[in-house]
Design a protein with these regions (language model features):
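Surface-exposed, short loops/turns at beta-strand junctions within beta-sandwich domains
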Residues: 2-5
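Short, solvent-exposed loop/turn segments at the edges of extracellular beta-sandwich modules
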Residues: 14-20
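Chitinase-like catalytic core of GlcNAc-active glycosidases
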Residues: 38-230
Length: 230
C-alpha cells in the first residue's frame, strides 16, 4: 500500500459481542492516526477557532487534517461535538444527558484522546429536546443538572460544555419552569461552579444570550468562557 492513497475494501463483519442492532443506520470506524503530537494548538495571536460539528455524518478526526502553513500548528483549537440532549427520564424522575448513537460511539472510543494529542480541546454540546431545555430549569434543577454535566465531562475526559437553546417549548416536568435568558444564565453559573476548570460556552441564539445581570455577585463573563455565533 502506498502513502497518501485512498483505498476501498469490502468488509464482512461478524460480531462476537452484544449491543449490535441489525436495524442501525450507521457504524463508526475509528482510525488510530499515530504521528506528531502537540502540547497545545494555541496561536501567538491569541485567536481561537471553534468547530461545531454534526457528529451524525462526520468523523471528528477530520480536524487533524487542517494545519497552519507557517507555524505548522493545528488550525482548530476547540471541537464541539453536536450534540447530546437534555431529557427527562420518566423512570428515574430526573433530568439527564442523553447521547445519540454517534455521540456514544465517539466518547467511548479514543477519538477524544486523539484530538487531545493534537492539542485541541473537546467540548460536548447539550441541546434541548421535546421534554426539556437548557433555559427551562429551576434554581434547584440547575444545580443538580450542572453536577451531572461535570460528572459527564470528567467521565469522558471532555473539556467543557456548549449550551444550545433550540427545539424546546415544553416545561411540564418537575424541575422545569417558564424559559428565559435568566434561567439559561443560572445553568451556566451553576455549571461553572460545578467544574471551574472546564469551559462553559453558549450559542448566541434564542435564550442562551443576553445575559445582563450578575448571579451571586458574578458577572456573566466570569461564568461563561466563550459565546459563539454563526
Amino acid at each position: 500500500m502506498s502513502q497518501n492513497v485512498t483505498y476501498a475494501f469490502p468488509l464482512q463483519v461478524t460480531s462476537t459481542t452484544t449491543g449490535v442492532h441489525s436495524g442501525a443506520d450507521h457504524i463508526v470506524f475509528v482510525k488510530n492516526c499515530k504521528g506528531k503530537k502537540f502540547a497545545s494548538s494555541a496561536k501567538p495571536s491569541g485567536i481561537k477557532l471553534f468547530s461545531c460539528m454534526e457528529t451524525g455524518s462526520t468523523n471528528p478526526l477530520f480536524h487533524k487534517s487542517f494545519m497552519l502553513e507557517k507555524s505548522g500548528l493545528p488550525l482548530f483549537d476547540v471541537v464541539i461535538l453536536f450534540s447530546a440532549k437534555i431529557v427527562y427520564d420518566e423512570q428515574e424522575c430526573r433530568l439527564k444527558i442523553w447521547n445519540t448513537p454517534a455521540i456514544s460511539g465517539i466518547i467511548q472510543s479514543d477519538v477524544v484522546k486523539q484530538l487531545h494529542d493534537y492539542g485541541m480541546k473537546v467540548v460536548i454540546s447539550v441541546l434541548g429536546s421535546e421534554e426539556a431545555g437548557v433555559a427551562h430549569l429551576t434554581d434547584a434543577a440547575c444545580k443538580t443538572f450542572a453536577q451531572e454535566i461535570a460528572n459527564y465531562c470528567e467521565a469522558y475526559d471532555l473539556d467543557g460544555v456548549f449550551f444550545d437553546d433550540e427545539y424546546t417549548d415544553s416545561w411540564n416536568h418537575p424541575g422545569l419552569t417558564s424559559p428565559s435568558s435568566e434561567r439559561a444564565a443560572r445553568l451556566c453559573y451553576e455549571t461553572k461552579m460545578a467544574m471551574p476548570d472546564k469551559m462553559v460556552t453558549c450559542y448566541i441564539y434564542s435564550r442562551t444570550c443576553g445575559f445582563h445581570s450578575k448571579i451571586e455577585g458574578m458577572e456573566p463573563g466570569d461564568f461563561v468562557d466563550y459565546a459563539i455565533s454563526d
